[in-house]
């Protein structure tokens, strides 16, 4: 169930770290579908942050694709420790249906052998670099929207509890865009 901390406090979450200046939402592990949970969030609201847990019901790729389906013309860069075949297929389907204007991946080089089948699916379709990375970040943007997704979950589904937040703050977006662009620029110089 989606709970706005400004209106109601979830008994399972200590809200003492949340101020009234930072609206948040909690996505409970009892919820059925990601789309049901995210339906109440207006990603066009500027400078908002929503916090969530997943309990294995959705992953980084699921949220990115869901948001891209709601806001047209989104560009996307995603970083992850790994990539599953399912996530790769979902990104390809989303791309083929026009959900993304651009889509790039930054993936962990040391663990690449663990997800080589997924890499083969997207190789040549999307820009992809491999480096030493453990961060799981998704950036979505167009001329009017700047959305950041940071989560403990990778581009793979598991039944573990994952935690993260979604922000529509331009400052948060550019904080992550700056270090991600640094990785992309460093990789371009090595090629």
Where on the chain are the PLM-derived regions?
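PLD/PLD-like phosphodiesterase catalytic module centered on the HKD motif
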Residues: 1-191
């Amino acid at each position: 169930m989606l709970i706005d901390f400004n209106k109601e406090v979830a008994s399972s979450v200590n809200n003492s770290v949340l101020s009234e200046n930072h609206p948040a939402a909690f996505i409970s592990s009892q919820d059925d579908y990601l789309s049901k949970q995210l339906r109440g969030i207006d990603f066009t609201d500027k400078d908002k942050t929503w916090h969530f847990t997943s309990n294995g019901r959705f992953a980084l790729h699921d949220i990115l694709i869901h948001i891209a389906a709601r806001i047209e013309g989104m560009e996307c860069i995603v970083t992850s420790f790994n990539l599953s075949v399912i996530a790769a297929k979902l990104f390809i389907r989303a791309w083929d249906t026009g959900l993304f204007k651009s889509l790039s991946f930054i993936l962990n080089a040391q663990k690449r052998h663990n997800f080589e089948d997924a890499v083969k699916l997207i190789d040549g379709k999307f820009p992809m670099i491999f480096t030493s990375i453990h961060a799981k970040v998704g950036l979505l943007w167009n001329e009017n929207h700047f959305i950041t997704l940071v989560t403990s979950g990778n581009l793979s589904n598991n039944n573990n509890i994952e935690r993260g937040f979604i922000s529509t703050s331009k400052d948060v977006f550019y904080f992550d865009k700056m270090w991600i662009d640094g990785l992309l620029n460093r990789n371009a110089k090595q090629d």
